[in-house]
A protein has these predicted regions:
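Short acidic, S/G/P-rich loop/turn micro-motifs used as interaction or catalytic elements
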Residues: 1, 25, 61, 365-368
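Conserved beta-strand segments of the P-loop GTPase G domain that flank and frequently precede/overlap
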Residues: 1, 19-21, 360
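Typically the conserved alpha-helix immediately C-terminal to a functionally engaged Cys/Sec
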Residues: 2-14
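A short glycine-leucine-enriched loop at secondary-structure breakpoints
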Residues: 43-47
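Iron-sulfur (Fe-S) cluster-binding modules
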Residues: 82-115, 122
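Non-transmembrane, aqueous-exposed alpha-helical and coiled segments at domain scale
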Residues: 108-411
Length: 411
């Protein structure tokens, strides 16, 4: 459509330079500069074609995007320019903003440099198999963290890629935002998941949580990452059916990224510092969202002092999930009794001081409590009261079991 306009501009504006992004012979009969590598388009920040730019002494003074006849006439000073054309056409998206290649262009021309050591593969090597053979995976295939993918991941945060977030245990290696992004790529995260990965890493690498201790124990435990806030819905986290299972990208890849970071950067590999005797599948990923909107109770985050509008991450050291079955209880007291009986057996029924638990209620059980107007605090207190037991029943040797608490706790 703009060929006649370009031809006329070439005649009346001798200093005009025409750039073409794809066909170097376009437009016919007009001398043009090929921009097949899109360098000129990238540096000129071209969003739409055609774009008409005026420069004075190398500095842009004005531009118009797409075809708006009145603006082209005003900028060029040609009163009858494009008389045969429609008044307005929006133009087409520039190839330099094509989602399939924009990350490659950012690496080539964006001036941003990745500082992590790059590993080159031989042309005959299978990149997925090499990631296995070099020990970069958790036993499942990982996404190769190309510079383009890492740059795309970094777009998920405004933090400086070279900011040191923590010293990653167990080897206490400087963990930068860039290295977090690399492992998030490998885990399969989208850029919008990156802030959640960063928050979880910041949480587990505190003295209070002590991820080094979680790794070094022989117990089958791993970080359980519980997410709250409107951001969980924005990124599509699962807080409903199959909440602890497979099938949700955000849940699985956020948790997986955290595990890969501790393995690949911190050095927490199984059989080395990671001394778990059995482990459990949650050591691949154990991350889920609470149903903030559907729950009849105060959310975990709010109960811990946060506002419901805030996005939060809570981390807990947990073993694999276990099922609590009670299909008959219709009174809250009955259901609380069931929960107490099941919780009493966590790890060992005679070691009540040693272990904590996270209780995840499904809608049916939650409804029993809600219909009785029990608050979150009431549910916890009722279960706690039912977990009391005589010290004589849990000391070492009682009930024919050597395990138990010390004799000093006997009544």
């Amino acid at each position: 459509m703009v060929v006649p306009v370009i031809a006329r501009l070439m005649r009346e504006l001798p200093s005009l330079t025409v750039y073409t992004q794809d066909d170097p012979t376009f437009p016919e009969g007009v001398t043009s500069v090929s921009d097949l590598d899109l360098a000129a388009s990238w540096h000129a920040d071209i969003d739409t074609v055609p774009t008409l730019i005026f420069r004075a002494n190398g500095v842009e003074t004005k531009r118009t995007i797409g075809w708006l006849r009145s603006e082209w006439r005003e900028l060029t000073g040609i009163a009858d320019l494009g008389s045969e054309l429609p008044e307005f056409r929006p133009g087409c998206g520039s190839m330099s903003v094509d989602p399939d290649i924009v990350d490659k262009l950012r690496v080539l021309y964006g001036g941003e440099v990745l500082h992590s050591r790059q590993i080159e593969f031989a042309s005959a090597e299978d990149e997925f198999e090499v990631m296995f053979s070099r020990g970069f995976t958790d036993g499942l295939p990982v996404v190769p963290p190309t510079p383009e993918r890492v740059m795309r991941m970094l777009s998920g945060t405004t933090r400086d890629p070279q900011e040191v977030v923590v010293l990653a245990p167990p080897d206490l290696v400087e963990l930068t935002i860039e290295k977090i992004a690399i492992n998030a790529v490998m885990a399969g995260c989208l850029p919008e998941y990156l802030p959640w990965v960063i928050a979880a890493i910041e949480a587990i690498c505190t003295d209070e949580y002590n991820i080094h201790g979680v790794l070094a124990t022989t117990m089958p435990v791993a970080p359980v990452i519980i997410c709250n806030g409107p951001g969980t819905r924005a990124i599509g986290m699962n807080s409903g059916v199959n909440v602890l299972g497979q099938g949700n990208r955000a849940n699985l890849t956020i948790g997986r990224a955290v595990q890969l970071i501790i393995r690949n950067v911190g050095g927490g590999r199984p059989g080395e510092v990671d001394r778990a005797a059995h482990g459990h599948p949650g050591k691949l990923s154990f991350c889920f969202a609470e149903d903030d909107l559907g729950s009849p109770f105060t959310s975990l985050a709010v109960s811990r002092g946060f506002d419901a509008t805030q996005n939060t991450v809570t981390v807990f050291t947990g073993e694999g999930p276990r099922c609590v079955v009670d299909q008959l209880a219709r009174e809250p007291e009955q259901l609380a009794q069931t929960f107490a009986a099941c919780l009493r057996t966590v790890h060992h029924p005679k070691l009540p001081f040693a272990f904590d638990a996270v209780l995840v209620l499904g809608p049916e059980h939650a409804r029993v409590f809600a219909q009785a107007n029990w608050s979150r605090e009431r549910v916890l207190q009722e279960i706690h009261d039912r977990l009391q037991m005589p010290g004589s029943e849990i000391v070492r040797g009682a009930g024919g079991m050597a395990e138990g608490v010390q004799e000093a706790f006997k009544d």
